Amino acid sequence: MPRGAQVIYPKDLGAILVHADVFPGARILESGDGSGALTMTLLRALGPEGHVLGYEIRDDFAGRARRNVEAFLGPDVPLTVEVRDVYEGIEATDLDRILLDLPEPWRVVPHAAGALARGGILCAYLPTILQVATLRAAIADSEFGMAQTFEVLHRTWHVEGQSVRPDHRMVAHTGFLTVARLLTPEPARPDAPDTPDTPDAEPSEAVDHDTGADDLADDLADPGS
């Protein structure tokens, strides 16, 4: 497949499908189309009833992604690729999923909250943990919740007769995946009912605790009584 931008590895593509809960018929915004590897993976999972809307800031990347998709899946696929900057906003609404392969996805978090349907999922792919930390801070200060970050390490095994061991090489870190869900706001609680004023309790009668002591003193002073 002709490439311009670096593609997302198959081990991460599979994790995106599962953890972003990509389902047949979903409406998905993908930004950072690059060479179209994730785009093709999504289209195969969505089926003919779904739709992928791509936002790609570079015209050459957008063209390459379209050509790669057509070469592998044909021209009749539910895909729209627009040359635009997702950092400036998202016009689409009621989306099911938003998938980002961008240097600064935290700038998209406020736009994503307005474009996703409630319960929709935001998923971002990032190469460095410092980028992840910035993204997670933005998510924590937004309407998103249930956030998690992970990476996928793929290790194959050498299996030949009784020789069974891990291969000497593995596809380890390629990127971090962060997934969060747009939560439904909690309903406003009704005001607490007014409690009727209750009259003050009657003061208890004063008890003369000294009375018994005085009587005893009088008896001792007058033994003949």
Predicted regions and their residues:
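Conserved SAM-binding loop of SAM-dependent methyltransferases across substrates and taxa
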Residues: 35-48
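S-adenosyl-L-methionine
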Residues: 55-105
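Conserved SAM/SAH-binding loop
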Residues: 9, 34-35
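Conserved SAM-binding loop and adjacent beta-strand
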Residues: 1-13
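Conserved class I S-adenosyl-L-methionine
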Residues: 25-34
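Short glycine-dipeptide loop
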Residues: 25, 48-49, 116-121
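Core SAM-dependent methyltransferase catalytic element
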Residues: 140-145, 154-225
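C-terminal substrate-binding/active-site "lid" region of AdoMet-derived donor-dependent transferases
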Residues: 106-176
